[in-house]
Amino acid sequence: RRRHSFPTRRSSDLAVLAIVSAYVLLNVAYSLRLKHIVLLDVFIIASGFMLRILAGTLGVGIAPSHWLLLCGLMLTLFLGFAKRRAELNALVGHGGSHRKVLDDYDPTLLDELTGICAGGAIIGYSLYTVSAETVAMHGTGDLIYTVPFVIYGIFRYLYLLHRRGGG
């Protein structure tokens, strides 16, 4: 019989199993129907990433912070909407088959959604770096100096999306 070093290890294992099961069901639902519903398609993809974050943190025996969840959600939504924008960019001047849901997206809407999500990720991360909990945990208030790198990374991604056809 396997012995666990933590009394809560079994409950953690069950939580990870439940999350992995939810992830599988979510992917099946996405493949069968949800990928055809505008906006919800990206939220489902982001939910899959969030479930992976939860499974990973619980799997190693730590509770996910609300900052990790907030920043993770905003970043995965940002990337999801940016990906849809890149797919629309690729369709310009090229016919052919594509995701049916793209017919329901508008470039301006996607630009606004990526901007909102990028702003949310930047604000969330910035607030994380100065929160009392974070300063106490890391023993420094200097994490605020990492914010420009996060902003640059997001801006660079947007530049590549809009000027280089990336995404």
What are these regions (language model features)?
Residues 3-11:
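Short, small-residue-biased leader/transition segments that mark boundaries at the very start
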Residues 10, 29-36:
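Short acidic, glycine/Ser/Thr-rich loop/turn "cap" segments at secondary-structure junctions
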Residues 10-21, 147-149:
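Structural signature of hydrophobic alpha-helical transmembrane segments
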Residues 19-30:
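Internal transmembrane alpha-helices of multipass membrane proteins
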Residues 26, 40, 155:
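Single, functionally critical "micro-switch" positions that shape active/binding sites
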Residues 32-35, 43-45, 49-167:
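C-terminal membrane-associated helical module and adjoining short loops/tails
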